[in-house]
Amino acid sequence: MDVLAEANGTFALNLLKTLGKDNSKNVFFSPMSMSCALAMVYMGAKGNTAAQMAQVLSFNKSGSGGDIHQGFQSLLTEVNKTGTQYLLRTANRLFGEKSCDFLSSFRDSCQKFYQAEMEELDFISAVEKSRKHINTWVAEKTEGKIAELLSPGSVDPLTRLVLVNAVYFRGNWDEQFDKENTEERLFKVSKNEEKPVQMMFKQSTFKKTYIGEIFTQILVLPYVGKELNMIIMLPDETTDLRTVEKELTYEKFVEWTRLDMMDEEEVEVSLPRFKLEESYDMESVLRNLGMTDAFELGKADFSGMSQTDLSLSKVVHKSFVEVNEEGTEAAAATAAIMMMRCARFVPRFCADHPFLFFIQHSKTNGILFCGRFSSP
């Protein structure tokens, strides 16, 4: 599992840097479910297509292909297990054009390792029906939170392979924030811009540490059951978040977030209430990282999937997070904003300027979600 955690973690941080190129934008995605979805496609890739995918997904570090798929099998079983105090639903499915004759061995492996089905649709003559079918399936899997994954016109009669990956998470904090302490405060988007935000407050004992080399505080907020943690990296006000992102490698992430190396201390925590819903068309991102052949008919080699000449037509990723006093959840709620002028006190961990956050599965060290809050 460790080699896989390293591969997924490396891919996660590479994605964070690529998706976050424009540092004024919020970022939120699930690297684990993205790795998972792409690993499923990788099972059917051969030759140079497979080599590029392994490179981008950092699988070249982790031994043979078989080990990877078995690793994902255990990871998914562990993360999606029932009886947890959080709700996590990953929805992975590969939709293929039905005239392409997909190999039954490939379909069986999707089911065995990735709890995922390969479904055949008629993109050639029923493109709109196919699009709606995919959207309905995603909406069901994400409790209605992600309703319109594929926008009109995003698939066409030439579409052969659509990889769909959506994820839904809801978890309550181990220690909730008191709603009565939430008040309007200003969030410093940049040196010369501030925006109002609903700032939550809690004084309690948390694990935290300070990384001197990047002038950044790290705070761990556990979810109920302590199987998942939110890890927040907050640079000092004089330090740009870009500096932290530049320095961040998977090795450093592991070193900096080791719970046994942190102090447990009383902290005054101020954290904005926020909701992010981000959608990414992953083709340009993956091409930037070096995975090009998979998208080009004639170059793509998916002979482990089908004898037909195939290429990936679409990779869409959408995820949704809401952080509020109870915890993190994917349910829409509107709050009336109250304008209150309050004397500003100086808390010890005050996330009133851009920060990175990660939701991590403690047992497997898997980074389930990765985000950057830059602006309300």
UniProtKB/Swiss-Prot annotation:
GO molecular function terms listed in the Swiss-Prot or TrEMBL record: serine-type endopeptidase inhibitor activity
Sites bearing Phosphoserine, chain numbering: S151
Compartmental location: Cytoplasm
Pfam families linked to this entry: Serpin
Keywords, alphabetical: Acetylation, Cytoplasm, Phosphoprotein, Protease inhibitor, Serine protease inhibitor
An annotated GO cellular component: cytoplasm
InterPro entries, A to Z: Serpin_CS, Serpin_dom, Serpin_fam, Serpin_sf, Serpin_sf_1, Serpin_sf_2
Task performed by this protein: Inhibitor of cathepsin G, kallikrein-8 and thrombin. May play an important role in the inner ear in the protection against leakage of lysosomal content during stress. May be involved in the regulation of serine proteinases present in the brain or extravasated from the blood.
PANTHER family in alphabetical order: SERINE PROTEASE INHIBITOR, SERPIN (PTHR11461), SERPIN B6 (PTHR11461:SF204)
Oligomeric and partner information: Forms a complex with the monomeric form of beta-tryptase.
The protein, known as: Serpin B6
